[in-house]
């Protein structure tokens, strides 16, 4: 029988699927990390605040509900100001994310091994003394205007938005009682919210696959085609084809950051002349040599988590492999109209 989840995990699970953490209470963490899509949203780029529905069927609503408690306009609904605003990066799966020492595509939440505490770019988060990258990571989407915060909380800095989320939970009798039961305190603390969400995500570890059975000696667990693919992947058939240089170990990642010349699509992160470039790791390290570098993803369950790369530029694993094989040709011939609205083509032009 399946072991019953602890009260902490149950609390984290409820928070993860509850829209109470978002500004207008219209979406939850699960909107972009849903079990139906292997804990992604199946989209190239996500629709956060102002969206309706799930996955590839999610669309921008005409109106935006403003939370009554923090309404700026005095109206319950306003014209949706987020129409057309896609999240800049592809929503990664959180399956096995508990095993990663860096979180986010740019690694802006990182456990560097110097001491026990996680380092981020935000002093308010660092001041919590969190030792779990998952816990620190959980505190960022709720303050992102386009992802979850919206405009219901007003133009407040991140730590004040988090304070309002905690206040909302405290005023909710159900959650107030749940937190007191789990943590034994009369008032809810921000770090408790973070630890509860992290506890749920730590349950999402899946490490049994045909490949695991194969390396344990069950040679029949892979087809002959898969075995030939593995020999190519590990550079045994062709040394020049050695995916394991970056995708190695149990998680098939080197935990590093690389510039793979992935076509720039989407709204970007403020880089370049148009502001639509995404400089990736350089936005964290402030080192120009890290421009366009992104975290090497784990290949665990990769067949379930399309589309691929930091901005969802490619829809299939075959396209990803072809890009690696001919980076320049693949980039020059890339047609972004397949994936995103023309407004967000960035520096990439449709193929002639």
What are these regions (language model features)?
Residues 1-352:
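Periplasmic c-type cytochrome electron-transfer domains
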């Amino acid at each position: 029988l399946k072991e019953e989840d602890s009260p902490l995990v149950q609390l984290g699970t409820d928070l993860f699927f509850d829209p109470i953490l978002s500004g207008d209470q219209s979406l939850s963490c699960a909107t972009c990390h849903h079990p139906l899509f292997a804990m992604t949203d199946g989209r190239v780029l996500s629709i956060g605040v102002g969206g309706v529905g799930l996955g590839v069927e999610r669309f921008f609503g005409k109106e935006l509900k403003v939370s009554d408690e923090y309404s700026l306009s005095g109206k319950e609904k306003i014209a949706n100001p987020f129409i057309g605003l896609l999240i800049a990066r592809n929503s990664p799966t959180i399956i096995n994310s508990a095993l990663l020492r860096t979180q986010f595509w740019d690694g802006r939440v990182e456990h560097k091994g110097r001491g026990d505490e996680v380092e981020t770019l935000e002093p308010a988060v660092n001041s919590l003394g969190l030792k779990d990258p998952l816990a620190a990571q959980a505190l960022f989407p709720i303050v992102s205007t386009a992802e979850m915060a919206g405009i219901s909380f007003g133009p407040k800095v991140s730590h004040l938005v988090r304070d309002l989320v905690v206040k909302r939970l405290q005023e909710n009798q159900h959650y107030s009682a749940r937190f007191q039961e789990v943590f034994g305190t009369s008032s809810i603390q921000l770090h408790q919210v973070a630890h509860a969400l992290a506890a749920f995500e730590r349950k999402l570890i899946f490490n049994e696959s045909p490949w695991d059975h194969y390396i344990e000696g069950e040679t029949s667990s892979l087809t002959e085609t898969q075995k030939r693919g593995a020999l190519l992947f590990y550079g045994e058939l062709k040394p020049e084809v050695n995916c394991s240089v970056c995708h190695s170990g149990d998680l098939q990642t080197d935990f590093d950051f690389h510039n793979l010349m992935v076509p720039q699509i989407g709204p970007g992160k403020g880089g370049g002349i148009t502001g639509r470039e995404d400089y990736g790791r350089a936005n964290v390290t402030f080192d120009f040599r890290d421009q366009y570098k992104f975290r090497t993803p784990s290949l665990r369950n990769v067949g379930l988590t399309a589309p691929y790369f930091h901005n969802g530029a490619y829809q299939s694993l075959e396209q990803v492999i072809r890009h690696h094989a001919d980076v320049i040709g693949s980039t020059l011939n890339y047609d972004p109209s397949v994936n995103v609205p023309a407004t967000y083509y960035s520096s990439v032009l449709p193929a002639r």
